[in-house]
């Protein structure tokens, strides 16, 4: 509903330019149209007069009065007030919210979507777990946040490419291989010959057992079969990494998370992209050698100190393949790139940005954008859950899904701002009560389905056309409050995308569900009067549609029965 108001205000500014009140070179400023905290200050407010007064040297309150007088008339606006130093407050007529409720049903699944992204390409990378063990709850939070961000960006008109970066090179992979090899040779954690820094979870024994049995792994484009040779380190490496990739993919599929691109870190070395990137940085003049190592002049690009790229032994530090990887994103045409990571990666961001800037190929500052999430604490029975027998040291995503559900796990992992620490209460997530937010929201959806089923069972035919035409019959305050809440949805979708804060969708859905439950308890719906009944069912169906659209952005289901 903000867009028509903005257009109206711009028409008023143009009228003042035309009659000489404003200089002809006065452009509409980047003004705000927002919903005040309380409706007594109006449904919407704008600071446009105060911004214009700065540009023209006018009294902002007088300019506000002049601008209001120049606004075209609108049936959607009941009255306009000037407040404080020059705020313009708009009080909307109920018909405006009735029209918006009708728009919901006309636009159906597209309600709330916009074209602000203009079909530009954005790469969203998330999860990107090392294939060294089961996905833990932190990976689950990354999956929930990243997948919701991708859905939000698509809803805002972006062409989204979902990407998973496999860190399948480095010391941790070497430790994995040595762990599986030791298990295959009959060793166990605690044995004298058990490797240092080995992984101790039961999943290592599972991999070794599968390897010794000659099992095959069905990957997307190939089948990998074990050689059963415990001395063949390369074969164990290939089998173990792909076994865990397959396990991770299984968990992500159960979590309703999919990707367009799976990118292997090892491919950067295999294809010579790491060496090629280093040579580009040398050629750009932003490196130097010292102490037998190759350094990046990262302080020239905002980092707090220069960084070693290639150590004296010839090996690369971990951020060098990260630069090569993000360079590949740029070369693949990503006008925008967003990387979702755990907050423990914070220290690497500046050096990756510095490396990309040092390439001097037109990559804009701040590309890629980063969304960092804080840790998750899992609670059961009032106590923290720290260990998983399968993983040997942490709570897995699979544990949470099996103990609660995919819907509950996704909701709880997305419900807080990414940079806030999160407590996952297993007991609460399993409750079928209004205290459980995902149950509360899904129950609102199911209630509408129940209403429609009851109407059918009672032979109370629903006429949506009549209902749309009769929304003015709903003059009570709870109906108006529900319509107002519905109308906020497109704004929330846009704001959540702009801020990269998908938890705002979850917050909004709780507020919408509360407005609906309040309306439901205060309003008999299946009344005898057909006109009134159709209007109420139309409002209920519009609520259901917005709930469905919002839950879809979260990747959470819409059960018709609870």
Curated annotation (Swiss-Prot):
SMART domains assigned to the protein according to its UniProt record, in alphabetical order: Arg_tRNA_synt_N, DALR_1
SUPFAM superfamilies membership: Anticodon-binding domain of a subclass of class I aminoacyl-tRNA synthetases, Arginyl-tRNA synthetase (ArgRS), N-terminal 'additional' domain, Nucleotidylyl transferase
Single GO cellular component term: cytoplasm
Main location: cytoplasm
Alphabetical keyword list: Aminoacyl-tRNA synthetase, ATP-binding, Cytoplasm, Ligase, Nucleotide-binding, Protein biosynthesis
Keyword Protein biosynthesis part of the UniProt annotation: yes
Subunit structure: Monomer.
Protein name: Arginine--tRNA ligase
Organism: Xylella fastidiosa (strain M12)
């Amino acid at each position: 509903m903000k867009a028509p108001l903005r257009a109206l205000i711009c028409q008023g500014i143009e009228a003042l330019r035309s009659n000489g009140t404003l200089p002809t070179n006065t452009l509409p400023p980047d003004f705000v149209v927002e919903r005040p905290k309380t409706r007594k200050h109006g449904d919407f407010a704008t600071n446009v007069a105060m911004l214009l007064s700065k540009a023209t040297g006018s009294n902002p309150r007088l300019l506000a009065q002049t601008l209001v007088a120049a606004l075209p008339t609108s049936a959607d606006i009941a009255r306009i007030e000037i407040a404080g130093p020059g705020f313009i407050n708009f009080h909307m007529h109920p018909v405006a919210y009735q029209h918006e409720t009708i728009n919901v049903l006309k636009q159906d699944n597209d309600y709330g979507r916009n074209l602000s992204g203009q079909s530009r390409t954005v790469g969203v990378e998330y999860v990107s777990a090392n294939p060294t063990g089961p996905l833990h709850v932190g990976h689950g939070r990354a999956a929930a946040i990243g997948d919701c961000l991708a859905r939000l960006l698509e809803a805002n008109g972006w062409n989204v490419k979902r990407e998973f970066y496999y860190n399948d090179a480095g010391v941790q992979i070497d430790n994995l291989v040595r762990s599986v090899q030791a298990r295959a040779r009959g060793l166990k954690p605690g044995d004298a010959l058990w490797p240092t820094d080995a992984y101790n979870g039961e999943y290592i024994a599972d991999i070794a057992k599968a390897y010794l049995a000659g099992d095959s792994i069905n990957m997307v484009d190939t089948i990998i079969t074990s050689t059963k040779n415990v001395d063949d380190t390369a074969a164990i490496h290939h089998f173990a990494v792909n076994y865990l990739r397959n396990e991770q993919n299984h968990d992500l599929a159960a979590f309703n998370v999919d990707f367009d691109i799976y990118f292997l870190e090892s491919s950067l070395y295999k294809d010579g992209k790491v060496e090629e990137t280093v040579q580009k940085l040398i050629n750009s003049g932003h490196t130097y050698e010292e102490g037998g190592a190759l350094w990046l002049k990262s302080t020239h690009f905002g980092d707090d100190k220069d960084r070693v790229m290639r150590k004296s032994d010839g090996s690369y530090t971990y951020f060098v393949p990260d630069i090569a990887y993000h360079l590949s994103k740029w070369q693949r045409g990503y006008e925008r790139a967003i990387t979702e990571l755990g907050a423990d990666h914070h220290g690497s961001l500046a050096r990756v940005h510095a490396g990309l800037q040092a390439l001097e190929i037109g990559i804009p500052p701040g590309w890629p954008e980063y969304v960092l999430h804080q840790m998750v604490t899992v609670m059961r029975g009032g106590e923290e859950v720290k260990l998983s027998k399968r993983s040997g040291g942490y709570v897995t995503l699979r544990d949470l899904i099996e103990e609660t559900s995919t819907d509950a796990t996704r909701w709880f992992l997305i419900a807080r701002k990414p940079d806030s620490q999160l407590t996952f209460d297993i007991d609460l997530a399993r409750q079928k009560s209004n205290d459980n937010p995902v149950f509360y929201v899904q129950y609102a959806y199911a209630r509408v389905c129940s209403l429609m089923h009851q109407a059918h069972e009672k032979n109370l035919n629903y006429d949506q056309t009549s209902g749309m035409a009769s929304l003015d019959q709903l003059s009570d305050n709870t109906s108006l409050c529900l319509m107002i809440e519905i109308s906020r949805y497109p704004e929330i979708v846009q704001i959540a995308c702009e801020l990269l804060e998908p938890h705002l969708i979850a917050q909004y859905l709780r507020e919408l569900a509360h407005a609906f439950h309040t309306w439901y308890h205060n309003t008999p719906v299946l009344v005898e009067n057909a006109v009134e009944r159709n209007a109420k069912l139309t409002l209920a169906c519009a609520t259901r549609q917005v709930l469905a659209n919002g839950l879809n952005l979260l990747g959470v289901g819409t059960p018709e029965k609870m």
